[in-house]
A protein has these predicted regions:
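FIC/Doc superfamily catalytic core
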Residues: 1-406
Length: 406
C-alpha cells in the first residue's frame, strides 16, 4: 500500500525532504499544471496503479461477457435497479433523505416534476453525451442535476456568482471540525476548474487516472455551496461509463458509501500541506473503489444468472407437467414465468402489466388470462402499489417444489 507524504512527515521526519524529492523527481512521476495549489501537483505510476488498471480492464471484459448472456428483461431490470440504488446512495452520502419509492416513480415517469426529478433524469441520460469542455458545462450539469432541489430546500445555498459561488465555503466533519476551505474568490474557482477540465481530457494521462484526478480536484475546488459531492460523483460515473461497461456508471456511489471512511480520509490526506501535492494515494484509493465496484457487479450478475438458469429448469419441468399436451399454452405460460423470474431476480419491484404486454408482445387481455390461469397463479406474486400492479415469480415456491422432488 502506498504511504502518503503526510504520514512520512510524522513517521520519518529526518528523511521526509529526501523522500519527497525522490518521489517528485522520479522517472515514474507525472506532473500536472494546476495553479491554485500550495505545491506542484504530481503522481507516481506505482505498481499498484498498474495492477488496478489491468484488473479493471479484465473485469470490464467479464462484465461485458456476463451482460451478453443476460436476457433483455434481466438486463434492463438490473440496470434500473442499479440506477435507483446509485441515486439513493449518492443522496445518502450527502445526508439527503430519499426513498426507493419516490425515485422509482420518477424513473417510471421521467417527465414528472416531483422532488429529485433532476438527478433521476440526468442519470437516466448517462449514456448521452454530456461532455465537459469548459467551466460553464460543469454549471449546466449542476443545474440539471441538483440545483432545482437545492434552491427549494436551502435558500442559503443559492448560487450568487457568474458561474459558481461568490462567497467562501467550508467542509466540515460530522462533529463540526473544519477540514477544508474551497477555493475563493470565484475567478480562482473558474481558473482552477478550467485547468482541472484540461487534465480530465489530457491525452498524456490514462483516462481512468484522469477521471480520478478530476474527482479529487472537484472536491478540492468545491465550486458550489451545496451539491458538490453529487455533481462530482455524477461526472465520474459519466466518464467511467464511457470508458467501461455502462452499468459501472450506476455502481460508483454504492461502493463509495461502503468505503466512505477511506474515501473521506483520502481527501483529507491529499489536502494536507505536508502531502506536497502528491495525488498518488488518492488515485490508488479511487481506482480501488472502481475496481471493487466491478468485482461486486460481477458477483451480483453471476449470482443472479445462476439462479435464473436454475429456476428456468424447474419451470420447464413444472409447467410441462401442469399443461401436459397443450404445447401452445406451455410455451405461453413458460415465456410469462421466465420473464417474471427475470424481473424478480434482477429488480426489486417485479414488472408491471404494461411492461409485460410490451415484452411478451401479447394483448393486455391475453396477459391477464395467462397470469390468472388456475394452474399457474400459485407461482405468481401480485404486489399492489396504489393503482399499479407489479408481478413477480414466487421463487420460494419454486425452491419448495424443487426440494420436494429431490
Amino acid at each position: 500500500m502506498y504511504i502518503p507524504l503526510t504520514k512520512i512527515y510524522y513517521s520519518n521526519p529526518n528523511d521526509y525532504a529526501k523522500i519527497y524529492s525522490n518521489k517528485f523527481n522520479s522517472e515514474s512521476s507525472e506532473h500536472l499544471k494546476f495553479s491554485n495549489f500550495d505545491s506542484e501537483l504530481f503522481f507516481l505510476y506505482t505498481k499498484n496503479i498498474a495492477h488496478l488498471l489491468y484488473d479493471i480492464q479484465k473485469h470490464n471484459g467479464d462484465v461485458i461477457k456476463l451482460c451478453e448472456k443476460l436476457p433483455a428483461v434481466a438486463l434492463t431490470s438490473f440496470g434500473r435497479k442499479c440506477l435507483i440504488d446509485e441515486i439513493l446512495q449518492t443522496n445518502e452520502i450527502e445526508g439527503v433523505h430519499s426513498t426507493r419509492k419516490e425515485i422509482s416513480i420518477i424513473v417510471e415517469n421521467p417527465s414528472s416534476q416531483k422532488r429529485f426529478h433532476g438527478i433521476v433524469n440526468k442519470y437516466l441520460k448517462l449514456s448521452e453525451d454530456t461532455e465537459i469542455e469548459k467551466a460553464e458545462d460543469v454549471r449546466k450539469i449542476y443545474d440539471e442535476l441538483v440545483y432545482g432541489e437545492i434552491k427549494s430546500d436551502d435558500k442559503n445555498s443559492i448560487l450568487d456568482g457568474v458561474i459558481f459561488r461568490k462567497d467562501t465555503v467550508g467542509i466540515y466533519t460530522s462533529t463540526g471540525k473544519k477540514i477544508h476551505t474551497g477555493l475563493y474568490p470565484e475567478n480562482k474557482i473558474i481558473e482552477a476548474m478550467t485547468e482541472a477540465i484540461t487534465i480530465l481530457h489530457s491525452k498524456e494521462i490514462n483516462s481512468l487516472i484522469a477521471i480520478s484526478i478530476f474527482h479529487y480536484l472537484f472536491g478540492y475546488i468545491h465550486p458550489f455551496y451545496d451539491g458538490n459531492g453529487r455533481t462530482s460523483r455524477f461526472i465520474s460515473s459519466y466518464y467511467f461509463s464511457k470508458e467501461l461497461n455502462p452499468l459501472i456508471g450506476y455502481r460508483l456511489s454504492y461502493t463509495i458509501k461502503e468505503n466512505i471512511k477511506a474515501y473521506y480520509e483520502s481527501f483529507e490526506i491529499t489536502n494536507n500541506k505536508f502531502n506536497r501535492g502528491d495525488l498518488t494515494y488518492f488515485i490508488e484509493m479511487f481506482l480501488g473503489v472502481l475496481n471493487k465496484s466491478m468485482t461486486n457487479l460481477i458477483s451480483a450478475l453471476k449470482g443472479r444468472l445462476e439462479k435464473l438458469n436454475f429456476y428456468k429448469e424447474i419451470l420447464v419441468s413444472e409447467i410441462g407437467k401442469r399443461f401436459d399436451g397443450n404445447k401452445k399454452l406451455i410455451n405461453d405460460e413458460l415465456n410469462l414465468m421466465y420473464v417474471l423470474t427475470q424481473a424478480t431476480l434482477f429488480s426489486d419491484d417485479g414488472i408491471t402489466l404494461n411492461k409485460l404486454t410490451e415484452v411478451i408482445e401479447k394483448s393486455t387481455g391475453k396477459i391477464r388470462q395467462l397470469i390468472t390461469n388456475e394452474k399457474i397463479k400459485d407461482l405468481i406474486i401480485v404486489n399492489t402499489q396504489k393503482r399499479k400492479h407489479c408481478y413477480s415469480a414466487d421463487c420460494s415456491k419454486l425452491d419448495e417444489m424443487n426440494l420436494s422432488n429431490c
